[in-house]
Amino acid sequence: MFALAAEAANLSMGNLGMGLGALGIMIGAGIGIAGAARGIGNIGGSAVEAIARQPEAKGSIGTNMIIAAALIEGFTFFALVIGLMLTLKLA
């Protein structure tokens, strides 16, 4: 009887550990996504300031801004995919 109760307790703690691991992974991915959002916001703000100071450079500034934002989005997507893969591996 006691062995059955101990086994049930171990099973529930194992599921809890996997759930907390998945939670930690996704919180980490969320922090990465929030950092990327802040970075893209900084890029956009700086680009608008630069265009306001030097309107004739609008084309090159806009192109560089879009390239940098796309690279950041790519890394963000990569972090999200890795987080999902690790979470699904825990299950």
Model-derived regions, located:
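Short, strongly hydrophobic alpha-helical membrane anchors
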Residues: 1-17
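Amphipathic alpha-helical segments that mediate coupling or scaffolding at interfaces
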Residues: 30, 50-51, 64, 70
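Juxtamembrane helix-loop transition segments at the membrane interface in multi-pass membrane proteins
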Residues: 37-56
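Membrane-interface alpha-helices at helix entry/exit sites of multi-pass transporters
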Residues: 56-67
